[in-house]
Amino acid sequence: EVPKSFYTDPLMYQATSAGFLGPRDPVVVPSEDYGIDLEAEVVVVTDDVPMAATPAQASGHIQLIGLINDVSLRGLIPAELAKGFGFLQSKPRSALSPVLATP
């Protein structure tokens, strides 16, 4: 069940931007023991959003909306989170949908 706080304070993170896989590209990792997990997620592309923008102001900066196949390596996540800096090795390239839509 989705925690109630997610409706007012959604879970978000900023990942590295090393590029994306194509929609049909294979997901290649050194070992399946890393715990490969695929997650369908929504991607929102914005232009420059000013710091401290309200949700209403930020919504005016949305340029594109699409789907992304987010790839996680579950076996690496606990150790990374324990370091206090978030995801890096546990988040390889994700696969971007071939189509994005304007809002």
What are these regions (language model features)?
Residues 1-103:
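Glycine-enriched loop-and-adjacent helix/strand subsegments that border the catalytic/binding cleft
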